[in-house]
Amino acid sequence: MAHRIVTQVVVTGARVFGRAFAEAYKQASAASKYQQKTGKSAGGSSSSGITLDEACKILNVKPPQAGETNLEQVMERFKKLFDLNDPQKGGSFYLQSKILRARERIEAEVREAERKAAHEKELKEGWKPKVYKDR
């Protein structure tokens, strides 16, 4: 009689575990397909989880136009807001981190635009090696 109860417990547990595993696999598969469509990875991205528009609103600056922005103004606003939200002065660490991420996002956008511009310039000019020593 005891072996029958033990067998039922094992079979029921295996069935529950199997269903849970199948459901978890379905959810992971759906999440993977969604990430592939949106182009985002679980490990994070260069956007550091904040959009450029949100970063500009946090620091109250204009979005970079063609990769150009006034970085002095961005740093000025960053320092002011970062110091105002110092936790030792009664500010919020959460707001400080949001301000830091906003500055990093804008700087990353400008760096990426500068890198692309330099790459385009190099492609436009072309690579002109000196083949002969006398020329």
Swiss-Prot record:
GO terms for cellular component: PAM complex, Tim23 associated import motor; TIM23 mitochondrial import inner membrane translocase complex. InterPro entries: J_dom_sf, Tim16. Heterodimer with PAM18/pamR. Component of the PAM complex, at least composed of mtHsp70, MGE1/mgeA, tim44, PAM16/pamP, PAM17/pamQ and PAM18/pamR. Residues 39-49 have a biased composition (Low complexity). Gene3D superfamilies: DnaJ domain. Its main location: mitochondrion. The keyword Protein transport applies. Residues 54-111 are annotated as: J-like. GO terms for biological process: protein import into mitochondrial matrix. The J-like region, although related to the J domain does not stimulate ATPase activity of mtHSP70. It nevertheless mediates the heterodimerization with the J domain of PAM18 and is therefore essential for PAM complex function. It comes from Emericella nidulans (strain FGSC A4 / ATCC 38163 / CBS 112.46 / NRRL 194 / M139) (Aspergillus nidulans). This is Mitochondrial import inner membrane translocase subunit tim16.
